[in-house]
Amino acid sequence: MGVYNKPPLTYTEQVELLISRGLLVSDKKRAERHLSNISYYRLSAYMRPYKQIANGVILDDFIPGSTWDMVYNLYVFDRKLRLLVFDAIERLEVAIRTQIIYQLSHKYGSHWQDDKNIFNSPKTITLRDGRKVVKDVYVDIQRHIKEQLNNNKAEEFIQHYCRKYDSPENPPSWMSVEVMYFNHLSRICTELKNRSDKTEIAEYFSLPPDIFCSWLHTINYVRNICAHHARLWNRGLDITPKVLKFSRVRVWISKPDTVKRSRIYYFLCMLNYLLQTINPTSTFKQRLKALLEKYSEIVSTDAMGFPHDWVNEKIWE
């Protein structure tokens, strides 16, 4: 273990450092302006594909011919990809929330979220550092509802309920669940005690319940990546979705077992599949193909997990 003692550099010094390492910068002032808006550290993730490698180690020096425009354009591509993905997730989130509320309220009543008996019992899990924590979806969603009830900036429909009713204490599910985060939606589906409850929600999206819950977990993970403006395009996904072997009702990829589910391509296929249900006229795939075409000279689809013949898949036609 060493001691970190690198001093902060001015934008001019940062540009000169990159030039000294072999990066071609045709317009230094433009590069400085980019660094002042984006930061060296954030952009460094987009420099890695252009760095030299020796014995499996990424070096400081750039591959000859690498330019500032390549780095910056890769950053821009990733930003546009995140926006495209986030837009699709937003549409899915609304539909998933709607189905959870609809299916469970018709089965268990308007306040099903207040019935702990429909959820699995609390679980104790051990973290990497050895600490033990209790995971209880019922307690967590009740805590969130109470926070909303006590928030003077809560949605108007929550405030209206509090002004007009004193029983039940919590608003009905179509209000309470409307203000929950995607993480809550994912956990609600996963922790429903009866498999039939999960099945009724998942069937709307043409998925088996175990696949649906797994995909929700991954969608929540990628949603957070997008929300925090983190690198997405060639990231290895830490939360890997389960494989959907085939679908009788929707167009799906022909050989799902051969696709790397830890890469973004499989996730993009997931989004496209789900969008077939909630928005059959979605232009998601057209916009994705246009984005990849525009940046084809700098983006490695291999690094994203795309098969070489992906454009021939029916799901992308």
Name these PLM-found stretches.
Residues 2-317:
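Long, contiguous internal "core" modules enriched in hydrophobic/ aromatic residues
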